[in-house]
């Protein structure tokens, strides 16, 4: 591991469960000398990636907030997806939240959400918060397009999440195969109670799965007819996003997001 990798590995120590670290604890955790760890911490503080609190405690620094702001205004996928997500909300016919998520290492990360009912708790997840790997339409539709060995490792590493989903990995793998064939995934109450999730995969370079788009609705207000219609719309939306993203990557102009969803929606009265 290079020195740069060792410095950056310190950032992975900071989690919601443990947001503050001392240099002494970090040195023990990473198995490096205390003097080396202090040198790493000082470099991260100087760059703004860490901030020092009292009593030799460190937390994530303000530079991360600045980077997040830059991503929000410069990420081409976000720019393309936002109008598409708003069109999906228009089709929901009730309270809903649309989530754009990316595959990040071995995590599914929410990078943007749009809701038509702010603060009503339609979905418990938000930007920057990882979603469960094995549960929920958002994650399962991504897993359905990953290599079997990768899914097997995730099943092993996140076994607690699998409780109540399938009695074995083989059964879970068979369910993912059905999702892959269908092109979308529907789940009920797997992440948030009394919620229905509908998701479709977003493919990137080389037709590799890069993320997913999903809509979360209140189960009591979602008819089978609406659910069937939303499946079609979500799949159309992901194709819109993938097509426009490929054009943007090549430096070509992309048509405004939501075109496929617009075509699938009935005309306004």
Regions found by a protein language model. Name each.
Residues 87-91, 96-99, 161-166, 182-189:
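Short helix-to-loop capping/linker segments positioned immediately adjacent to catalytic or ligand/cofactor-binding
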Residues 247-269:
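Short, highly charged C-terminal tails/helix-capping segments
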Residues 50-51, 100-101, 202:
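A structural signal for short hydrophobic beta-strand segments in well-ordered beta-sheet cores
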Residues 1-74, 78, 239-244, 267-269:
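N-terminal helix-turn-helix
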Residues 144, 237-248:
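Signal-transmission/dimerization alpha-helices at domain junctions
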């Amino acid at each position: 591991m290079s020195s740069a990798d060792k410095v950056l590995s310190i950032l992975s120590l900071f989690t919601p469960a443990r947001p503050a670290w001392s240099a002494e604890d970090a040195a023990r955790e990473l198995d490096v000398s205390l003097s080396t760890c202090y040198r790493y911490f000082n470099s991260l503080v100087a760059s703004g990636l860490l901030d020092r609190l009292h009593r030799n405690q460190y937390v994530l620094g303000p530079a991360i907030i600045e980077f997040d702001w830059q991503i929000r205004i410069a990420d081409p996928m976000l720019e393309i997806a936002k109008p598409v997500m708003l069109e999906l909300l228009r089709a929901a016919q009730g309270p809903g939240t649309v989530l754009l998520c990316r595959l990040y290492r071995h995590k599914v990360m929410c990078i943007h959400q749009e809701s038509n009912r702010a603060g009503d708790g339609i979905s418990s997840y938000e930007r920057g918060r990882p979603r469960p790997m094995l549960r929920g339409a958002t994650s399962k539709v991504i897993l359905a397009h990953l290599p079997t060995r990768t899914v097997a490792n995730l099943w092993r590493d996140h076994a607690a999440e699998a409780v109540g989903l399938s009695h074995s990995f083989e059964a879970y793998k068979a369910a993912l195969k059905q999702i892959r064939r269908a092109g979308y995934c529907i789940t009920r109450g797997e992440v948030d109670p009394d919620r229905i999730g509908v998701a479709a995969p977003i493919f990137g370079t080389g037709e590799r799965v890069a993320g997913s788009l999903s809509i979360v609705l209140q189960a009591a207000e979602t008819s089978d007819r609406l659910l069937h219609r939303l499946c079609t719309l979500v799949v159309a939306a992901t194709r819109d996003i993938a097509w426009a993203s490929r054009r943007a990557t090549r430096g070509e102009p992309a048509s405004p997001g939501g075109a496929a969803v617009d075509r699938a929606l009935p005309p306004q009265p």
